[in-house]
Curated annotation (Swiss-Prot):
Domain of life, per lineage: Eukaryota
Task of the protein: Methyltransferase; part of the gene cluster that mediates the biosynthesis of the unguisins, gamma-aminobutyric acid (GABA)-containing fungal cyclic heptapeptides with the amino acid sequence cyclo-(D-Ala1-D-Val2-L-Leu3-beta-MePhe4-D-Ala5-D-Trp6-GABA7) for unguisin H and cyclo-(D-Ala1-D-Ala2-L-Leu3-beta-MePhe4-D-Ala5-D-Trp6-GABA7) for unguisin I. Within the pathway, the methyltransferase ungE' is probably involved in the synthesis of the (2R,3R)-beta-methylphenylalanine residue incorporated by the module 4 of the nonribosomal peptide synthetase (NRPS) ungA'.
Assigned keywords, A-Z: Methyltransferase, S-adenosyl-L-methionine, Transferase
Disulfide bonds: none
Pathway assigned in UniProt: Secondary metabolite biosynthesis
EC nos: 2.1.1.-
Family, similarity comment: Belongs to the methyltransferase superfamily.
Protein name stated in the entry: Methyltransferase ungE'
Organism, as annotated: Aspergillus campestris (strain IBT 28561)
Example GO biological process: methylation
EC top class, as a word: transferase
Record InterPro entries: Methyltransf_25, SAM-dependent_MTases_sf, WH-like_DNA-bd_sf
Coiled-coil positions: none
SUPFAM superfamilies, A to Z: S-adenosyl-L-methionine-dependent methyltransferases
Length: 342
């Protein structure tokens, strides 16, 4: 081996170090270190560990990982902002989604690659961590387009259902802005909606917001759906696919929510894998943040990710009409569709 020098790390060392740092960014956000450095400017490592009941050597390791990629800088035992802190903070939930929420999937890549293992419930992710990350992803990337669509509605919202509601934060924001409205959140992840229900009660929405555990793709008519006039669905529309199933799901939503005047459907779309010659396709040297993890992760789970063109090709058969499309280019290539009954 060569001697230790101050030369830049070779490419594979950068890849290795970045893999550790990616986990560290998600963890640092969850334990509050990123916010502490951002807000306080200087954080004593030992004091932070003691105040938050964290193992001191592990926190020192966490800080070292962040320092290697210049998210923070370490001055003796004091952590200060590094050159990449602002960008890391802006994208923190993407790292959390990848490494904490989906870590159980990626750490078993060698297992899920084998067809002999791809039966039944062959992969694991952390639904509560996914919900936590998706709340911030929605806030950072989808909210501007979502609220533009909400502000453009030409009717007063009375009853809203969020399909794949996760933490329920979107519904609570809607209820804040529309005090006359009530809401229902539907999600297949029981742990996520248990947290959401407790949060809703704590924030005073207990009599206006309820949560139902269930698969949004298989939802059946209930009396409480009769007057729902707004449907929202973010970061789970790809679960409707492949095409025939997506059309069937859209038709089902059309029947189950007969009074819905708008369906706001937002999701990231496929731009990397199996997109030869596609108008929005990217190549290896231009892959944006999130795209690789999002597309590879869903490929391993056996979930089909549609392109924008494929989405636009199912609305009519599904019983909906697209009245407006909001593109979001800061998160892979994402979109918010405004749909109405055809």
């Amino acid at each position: 081996m060569g001697s230790w020098t101050s030369d830049p790390a070779p490419p594979m060392a950068e890849v290795f170090n970045s893999a550790v740092a990616a986990v560290a960014i998600g963890a640092a956000w969850e334990v509050g270190l990123l916010d502490a450095v951002k807000d306080q400017k200087k954080v004593d490592v030992f004091q932070f560990a003691a105040e938050n009941d964290l193992d001191r050597p592990s926190v020192q390791g966490l800080v070292a990982a962040l320092a290697v990629v210049q998210v923070v800088a370490l001055e003796q035992n004091t952590v200060v902002a590094g050159r990449q802190l602002e960008e890391a903070y802006r994208t923190k939930s993407l790292f959390h989604w990848l490494c904490l929420g989906s870590g159980g999937l990626f750490s078993r890549m060698q297992y899920v690659l084998r067809n002999e293992h791809r039966t039944g419930d062959f992969h694991r992710r952390d639904p509560a961590a996914i919900a936590h990350a998706c709340h911030d992803i929605n806030k950072q990337y989808f909210d501007p387009a979502f609220w533009a669509a909400m502000d453009g509605l030409d009717y007063p919202v009375q009853s809203v259902v969020d399909l794949g509601c996760g933490s329920g934060q979107r519904l609570m924001q809607i209820l804040d802005r529309h005090p006359q409205a009530s809401a229902i959140g539907i999600d297949v992840a029981g742990p996520a909606i248990q947290v959401a229900a407790r949060d809703a009660v704590a924030r005073g929405f207990g009599n206006r917001l309820v949560f139902r555990e269930g698969d949004a793709r298989e939802v059946s008519y209930r009396d409480e759906f009769e007057h729902v006039d707004l449907l929202t669905c973010f970061m789970m529309g790809h679960d409707f696919w492949p095409r025939d199933k997506c059309i069937a799901t859209l038709q089902r939503l059309r029947r189950v929510f007969p009074a819905a005047r708008r369906l706001l459907l937002g999701d990231a779309t496929r731009i990397l894998l199996d997109t030869p010659g596609g108008q929005q396709a990217v190549r290896n040297g231009t892959v944006p943040i999130f795209t690789l993890g999002f597309e590879v992760g869903h490929a391993m789970m056996g979930v089909y990710l549609p392109t924008i063109d494929e989405w636009e090709g199912v609305f009519a058969e599904g019983g909906w009409r697209c009245v407006k499309k909001h593109l979001i280019e800061s998160l892979s290539l994402s979109v918010v569709f405004e749909l109405e009954h055809a």
